[in-house]
């Protein structure tokens, strides 16, 4: 168990405890995307910067764009530099165990041996026997019969075993051993003294059997016969038949596949790490729903048994966490693991705000997550970096001054969660085993509808009734389960009631344990589908509900809570309550006793109460009997004022359209990524002149920022350019230039030489994610950025016009990225709450010497004396309107990936792509009003 360093004070409240505690072990870490040619000084500088932002460590992560050869001596030298600097800074380092993802193939090296490649099955109905097939069947009245060569049938139901040239067979222990030898061992050979110190351990990412078809392994056949005493091929056709007689085979098959997944991959890594004095963390693939857990390992919960710090991921703004985070939080509670990691914020887009990031984290921490791995901190935004599943943290983030506050918040919340135990009297048996009944990889509809949709209704009922519970996974129950005095025990946890949640299928062990529990007077509820199968066989299951779902026990301190919440107890007996409201309306909470609300952002506690209103998209943290005297804010009056626009940082124009002249004399023009894909698909090799143009209404000074690429002959309006290093990115350069009235042109020469290789990796439909994730290339035509004192007008720049409150993107600040200032005057006295109305990432309110920020919540508060007060409001944008994506037709709320920018694969020519819209889609920015409550 991780121990924090703290001073002992007998009568302290939670805020005092946090102040007296070293929270470093609970501070967020980041995926540090090392995606360029690595330089020692820059590595050290970025680590120091991260430390100043309140981060506790990094995951050192090779990603697309990196040109330092992976696992080369240069690579290990840079790893050593980073470990040395991290040690000096007191930061933790996790080594990501792959180049790209998923983990296991050593950046593609293990694929050279065909025996290592991932296996999968394909099914065809044929008119003749194919001796090259893996298995051939007749199908008589729905019953498959394995055919030998020479036997006849009306139709030949044929199964082929295929192999993937893009990923490895991680269920094969020999492959995992090669992976360890090629990846883990070299780190130990070089850095053994740092293991268990600054090199905390390894992060393994999305290991999976072949996810794009029905999976199998080279060892499945032998292991199936060894486990069940049956021939695998006798029933293999059932993996493709949607009927009840297939259930027993599918239950056996996917239980075996999950065991091979856990024992032959996770456990081998886990055992190696424990033997070498370090830890294992990382996550499986697609933990969000029960049916999607079939895409990687046929059940995620069991993998958490073989990690020191079990982990999940939660992508995009609105990905639900009710299954993934509750699943992992429950197993961690049952196994006594007090650190639970989430890889989070990836794909949430450049438009995501600190308030949205806080909610993304809160909705996972409420279920037991307590350590955050933030996705992503780019070594460089150049090339693939800026489109790599944003958001991206670092110096280019306009609200970077508030980033430490975000990290301080989650360090404090993580400490509280990790140091406490949840009061959860109910065990909810999940329907993971039921997924196997109807699961067909190429038609998941039945599994989704029969399992996940029904379970969602049960989860909603539990939430409405304020039931506090843990999940119980039946495979975990097999290993850790028991009964005691009418209670169910799982590892170190005891549950006084059990709910079967939409479980059509149960393991025989589960039926036995619950039978024992009920016989001893235990409480059992059933919701959703009732159990009808045991180990896949239709059975009159001898379990009867003796309590209604709504009557399940809940903590006595909770009277009414229609939200996700956790009531937790610290070792010294102090309790706290944490609830999260993902809804669009405020929600009411009623507790029994006195609970003092705490604001972790400001470090304030307020007088105890028992009834609370949790704001929309907000959360509540309250300490039982907290010793705080300050009353909670109550407003007698609210006024709304329209602020006056004062000024702004330099404006920006993003130029993303290019004209490319080829050696043949042909010219292509349009969106840079469309032009690039068109050239690559043609297989073009040769020189080209790349031109960016924009118009200006008058001569004016500008600053041009471009990426460092292997180009030559750079000119602006025909004159050579004297670039200098940009302060915002190691691979950006800038130049002060004089734009002229009319058209202005930035141009250079480049040469495409690798079109065939790029085409093969990026645009062949058969090439999966794994190979693209570790592929580095240069387009030679990335967007460029014009900064200066101007307004944006169409594709050009013009004289600044007066600005007013409202959306500034409609007032000539289309691509603005930075801070603007407003002012207003108000008469108020005492405690004042200031709520910015509009679109922003962070708002700083300045009144004389007083400062307060609206960052993680929607308001700022400050104490004012009597009279009129002049306020300055510093309002920060996100990075979205500078970096995009601008032309993607989809809604970004579902997640943003590189394809959202490049629209990869869809270009029929440089102008035509069904995913492309020629309009430039922007996100509103600016304040329309400020509400003042006092």
Question: Predicted segments — roles?
Answer:
Residues 98-109, 627-639, 751-797, 876-934:
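Glycine/proline-rich low-complexity spacer/linker segments in large multi-domain proteins
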Residues 61-181, 192-193:
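Acidic/aromatic-lined carbohydrate-recognition and catalytic surfaces
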Residues 135-192, 604, 609-630, 741-743, ...:
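Extended acidic/polar, glycine-enriched regions
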Residues 131-140, 710-720, 842-847:
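Extended low-complexity, serine/threonine- and proline-enriched intrinsically disordered segments
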Residues 485-486, 501, 506-512, 729-733, ...:
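C-terminal structured "cap/appendage" subdomains that terminate the fold
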Residues 2, 6-10, 22-29, 39-45, ...:
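Carbohydrate-binding surfaces of carbohydrate-active enzymes
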Residues 744-750, 832, 869-875:
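Extracellular beta-strand-rich recognition modules
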Residues 135-172, 236-260, 329, 333, ...:
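Alpha-amylase-like alpha-glycosidases and glucanotransferases acting on alpha-linked glucans and related
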């Amino acid at each position: 168990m991780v121990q924090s360093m703290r001073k002992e004070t007998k009568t302290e409240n939670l805020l005092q405890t946090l102040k007296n505690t070293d929270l470093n072990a609970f501070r967020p870490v980041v995926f540090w995307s090392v995606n360029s040619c690595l330089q020692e000084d820059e590595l050290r500088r970025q680590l120091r910067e991260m430390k100043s932002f309140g981060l506790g460590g990094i995951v050192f992560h090779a990603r697309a764009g990196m040109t330092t050869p992976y696992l080369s001596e240069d690579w290990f030298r840079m790893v050593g530099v980073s470990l040395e600097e991290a040690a000096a800074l007191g930061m933790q380092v996790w080594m990501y165990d792959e180049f790209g993802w998923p983990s296991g193939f050593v950046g593609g090296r293990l694929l050279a041996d065909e025996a290592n490649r991932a296996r999968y099955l394909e099914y065809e109905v044929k008119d003749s026997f194919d001796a090259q097939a893996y298995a051939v069947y007749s199908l008589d009245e729905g019953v498959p019969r394995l055919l030998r060569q020479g036997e006849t049938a009306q139709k030949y139901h044929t199964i082929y075993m295929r192999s993937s040239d893009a990923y490895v067979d991680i269920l094969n222990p020999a492959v995992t051993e090669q992976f360890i030898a090629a990846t883990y061992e070299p780190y130990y050979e070089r850095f053994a003294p740092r293991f268990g110190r600054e090199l905390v351990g390894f992060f393994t990412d999305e290991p999976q059997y072949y996810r794009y078809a029905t999976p199998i392994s080279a060892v499945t056949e032998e292991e199936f016969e060894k486990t069940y005493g049956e021939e695998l091929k006798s029933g293999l056709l059932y993996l493709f038949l949607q009927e009840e007689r297939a259930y027993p085979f599918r239950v056996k098959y996917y239980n075996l596949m999950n065991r091979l997944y856990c024992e032959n991959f996770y456990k081998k890594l886990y055992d190696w790490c424990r033997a070498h004095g370090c830890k294992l963390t990382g996550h499986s693939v697609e933990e969000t729903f029960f049916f999607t857990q079939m895409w990687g390992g046929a059940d995620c919960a069991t993998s958490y048994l073989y990690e020191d710090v079990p982990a999940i991921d939660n992508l995009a703004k609105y990905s639900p966490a009710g299954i993934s985070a509750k699943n992992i939080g429950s197993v961690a509670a049952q196994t006594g693991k007090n650190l639970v990691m989430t890889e989070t914020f990836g794909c949430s887009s450049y438009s995501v705000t600190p308030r949205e990031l806080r909610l993304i984290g809160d909705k996972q921490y409420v279920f037991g997550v307590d350590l955050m791995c933030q996705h992503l901190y780019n070594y460089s935004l150049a090339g693939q970096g800026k489109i790599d599943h944003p958001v991206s943290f670092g110096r280019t983030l306009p609200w970077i001054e508030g980033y430490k506050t975000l990290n301080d918040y989650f360090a404090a919340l993580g400490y509280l969660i990790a140091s406490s135990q949840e009061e959860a009297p109910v065990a909810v048996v999940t329907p993971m085993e039921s997924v196997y009944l109807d699961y067909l990889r190429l038609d998941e509809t039945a599994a989704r509808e029969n399992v996940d949709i029904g379970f969602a209704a049960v989860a909603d009922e539990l939430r409405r009734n304020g039931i506090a519970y843990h999940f119980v996974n039946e495979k975990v129950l097999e290993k850790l389960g028991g009964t005691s005095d009418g209670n169910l025990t799982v590892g170190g946890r005891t549950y006084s009631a059990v709910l079967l949640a939409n479980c059509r299928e149960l393991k025989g062990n589960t039926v036995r344990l619950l039978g024992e529990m009920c016989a001893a007077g235990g409480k059992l509820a059933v919701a959703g589908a009732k159990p009808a199968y045991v180990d896949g066989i239709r059975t009159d299951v001898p379990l009867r509900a003796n309590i209604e779902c709504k009557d399940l026990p809940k903590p006595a301190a909770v009277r009414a809570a229609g939200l996700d919440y956790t009531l937790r107890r610290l070792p010294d007996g102090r309790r706290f309550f944490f609830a999260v409201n993902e809804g669009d309306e405020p929600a009411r909470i009623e507790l029994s006793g006195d609970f003092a609300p705490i604001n972790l952002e400001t470090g304030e506690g307020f007088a105890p109460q028992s009834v609370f209103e949790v704001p929309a998209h907000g959360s509540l943290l309250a300490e039982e009997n907290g010793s705080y005297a300050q009353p909670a804010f109550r407003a007698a009056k609210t006024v709304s004022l329209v602020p006056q626009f004062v000024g702004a940082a330099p404006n920006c124009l993003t130029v993303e359209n290019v004209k490319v002249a080829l050696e043949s004399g042909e010219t292509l023009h349009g969106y840079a990524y469309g032009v690039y894909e068109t050239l690559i698909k043609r297989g073009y090799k040769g020189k080209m002149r790349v031109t960016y143009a924009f118009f200006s209404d008058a001569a004016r000074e500008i600053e041009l920022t471009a990426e460092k690429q292997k180009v030559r002959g750079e000119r602006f309006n025909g004159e050579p350019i004297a670039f200098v290093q940009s302060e915002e990115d190691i691979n950006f350069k800038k130049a002060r230039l004089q734009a002229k009235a009319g058209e202005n042109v930035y141009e250079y020469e480049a040469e495409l030489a690798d079109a065939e290789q790029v085409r093969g990796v990026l645009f062949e439909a058969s090439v999966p994610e794994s190979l693209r994730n570790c592929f580095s290339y240069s387009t030679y035509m990335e967007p460029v950025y014009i900064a200066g004192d101007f307004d944006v007008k169409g594709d050009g720049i013009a004289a600044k016009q007066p600005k007013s409150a409202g959306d500034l993107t409609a007032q000539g600040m289309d691509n603005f990225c930075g801070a603007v200032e407003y002012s207003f005057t108000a008469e108020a006295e005492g405690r004042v709450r200031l709520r910015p109305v509009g679109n922003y990432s962070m708002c700083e309110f300045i009144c004389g010497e007083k400062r307060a920020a609206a960052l993680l919540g929607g308001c700022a508060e400050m104490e004012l004396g009597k009279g009129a007060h002049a306020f300055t409001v510093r309002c920060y944008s996100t990075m979205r309107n500078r970096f995009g994506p601008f032309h993607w037709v989809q809604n970004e709320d579902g997640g943003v990936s590189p394809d959202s920018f490049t629209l990869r694969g869809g270009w029929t020519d440089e102008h035509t792509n069904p995913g492309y819209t020629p309009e430039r889609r922007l996100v509103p920015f600016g304040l329309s009003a400020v509400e003042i409550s006092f």
